[in-house]
Swiss-Prot record:
Job of this protein: Catalyzes the conversion of glucosamine-6-phosphate to glucosamine-1-phosphate.
GO MF, one example: phosphomannomutase activity
Family: Belongs to the phosphohexose mutase family.
Catalysed reaction equations from the record: alpha-D-glucosamine 1-phosphate = D-glucosamine 6-phosphate
Organism: Bradyrhizobium diazoefficiens (strain JCM 10833 / BCRC 13528 / IAM 13628 / NBRC 14792 / USDA 110)
Catalytic site positions: S101 (phosphoserine intermediate)
CDD domains: GlmM
Gene designation: glmM
Descriptive protein name: Phosphoglucosamine mutase
Length: 447
């Protein structure tokens, strides 16, 4: 059974396009019914980021959950990993994050977490999809059994304390000037406060959300503003989160971007030296640079690859017994601490290495020279452009031209109508030409 609503990271789409109040109401009802197990009073934690449509989706979901007898705990704007953590710590049956992650404000989405704070399995999502398409009038709660909703205070402090506990008690960030870009998103209150409490000299940007400016020319997908601010303030490091703070990109003191592959290399080597890796290896996706794989091999560590999506990274980590994994895009999963990607906690692990080494970030965070990698996106209006004969021919020709000295990865995005074309190899000019040829063919097929 193919999935109708769920993509690789929950349900996501244009606000009042795919993501309507009606859909949010039905998702609340369907998920509420799916997670009502046993006779106890059931409850759900709902968080959101700062986009304008969050209010609309939040209230519709409250109506859905309460209509099937589930109590709702509202925590307001909070990072996705904080919602996952709170779901578990507050003994809730379900967690919801209303966010479209790194997308602009026009989009929104619904991410669901089980009682242990993990994203739902494909099977559970399919069960919810079946309920979405079934009439549930006869399964609504009786008047006396309707759910209640309340806003919870103090949740910011809970997450701040959780994040601080991932560092040794004797480690302070004193002496570090840190510019942090919260993308005008969910972390705009908690992360600057946590850094200040840890002793850093904090310069916050992207902390003035207005409902429209989330991820707009800021955050992990647009680190240019952060790079400029780091140089301007002569800071030691810059931290760029995305709209829901489940991914992170760093900037060194020179303003150069440090991607998720380099972060994985830093943490992997540090944890190996400290004996903290549960297995001699880490998990990453097919998008991670071959340079990372070669670096890890030199450290005696394996790299296990998965399809794109942090959920698949986590599944492999759990099944294989790994405690470190992530994506080049900055989703870093540290399963000793969190059940999902946590951009801030990942940044803290790197800051710990910087403090211990007393070396510049540009030295600490450059563990390998990445192979030239070209990634381009082709937006389409539907259909199957990858099945076009000219596209297939361009891909086949490209693979022959790389001839074992590089690789191609062409895939449809699981979160938006985009086909991603990635080429990697030792000859940058050749890789660019191969990718451009495929992108041109896709553009004509998608027109």
């Amino acid at each position: 059974m193919s999935r109708k609503y769920f993509g690789t990271d929950g349900i996501r789409g244009r606000a009042n396009g795919l993501i309507t109040p009606e859909l949010a109401l039905k998702v609340g009802q369907a998920a509420g019914l799916a997670f009502q197990r046993g006779d106890h009073r059931h409850r759900v934690v709902i968080g959101k980021d700062t986009r304008l449509s969050g209010y609309m989706i939040e209230y519709a979901m409250v109506a859905g959950f309460t209509s099937v007898g589930m109590d709702v705990l509202l925590v307001g704007p909070m990072p996705t990993p904080a919602v996952a953590m709170l779901t578990k710590s507050m003994r809730a049956d379900l967690g919801v994050m209303i966010s479209a992650s790194h997308n602009l404000f026009e989009d929104n989405g619904i991410k669901l977490f089980g009682p242990q704070g993990f994203k739902l399995s494909d099977d559970v999502e399919k069960q919810i999809e079946q309920l979405l398409d079934e009439p549930i009038d006869k399964r609504l709660a009786q008047s006396a059994s309707l759910g209640r909703a309340r806003r919870i205070d103090g949740v910011h402090d809970r997450y701040i304390e959780f994040a601080k506990r991932t560092l040794p008690r004797d480690l302070s960030l004193d002496g570090l000037r840190v510019v942090v870009d919260c993308a005008n998103g969910a972390a705009y209150k908690v992360v600057p406060e946590a850094l200040w409490e840890l002793g850093a000299d904090v310069v916050p940007i992207g902390v003035e959300p207005d409902g429209f400016n989330i991820n707009k020319d800021c955050g992990s997908t647009s680190p240019e503003a952060l790079s400029k601010k780091v140089r301007e303030m002569r800071a030691d490091i810059g931290i760029a989160l995305d709209g829901d703070a489940d991914r992170v990109i760093l900037v060194d003191e020179r303003g150069h971007v440090v991607d998720g592959d380099q972060l994985l290399a830093v943490i992997a080597q540090s944890w190996k030296e400290d004996g903290r890796l549960s297995r001699p290896g880490i998990v990453a996706t097919v998008m991670s640079n071959l340079g990372l794989e070669r670096f890890l091999k030199g450290q005696g560590l394996d790299l296990v690859r998965t399809p794109v999506g942090d959920r698949y990274v986590l599944e492999q980590m759990l099944s294989g017994g790994y405690n470190l994994g992530g994506e080049q895009s900055g989703h870093i999963i540290l399963s000793d601490y969190a059940t999902t990607g946590d951009g801030f906690v990942a940044a803290l692990q790197v800051l710990a290495v910087v403090q211990k080494s007393r070396r510049p970030v540009s030295e600490v965070c450059h563990r390998f020279d990445p192979l030239p990698q070209i990634l381009k996106n082709v937006r389409h209006k539907g259909g199957k452009p990858l099945d076009d004969s000219d596209v297939k021919s361009a891909i086949s020709d490209g693979e022959k031209r790389l001839n074992g000295h590089g690789r191609l990865l062409i895939r449809s995005s699981g979160t938006e109508p985009v086909i991603r074309v990635m080429g990697e190899g030792e000859d940058r000019i050749l890789v660019e030409d191969v990718v451009d040829t495929i992108v041109s063919a896709l553009g004509q097929a998608a027109a």
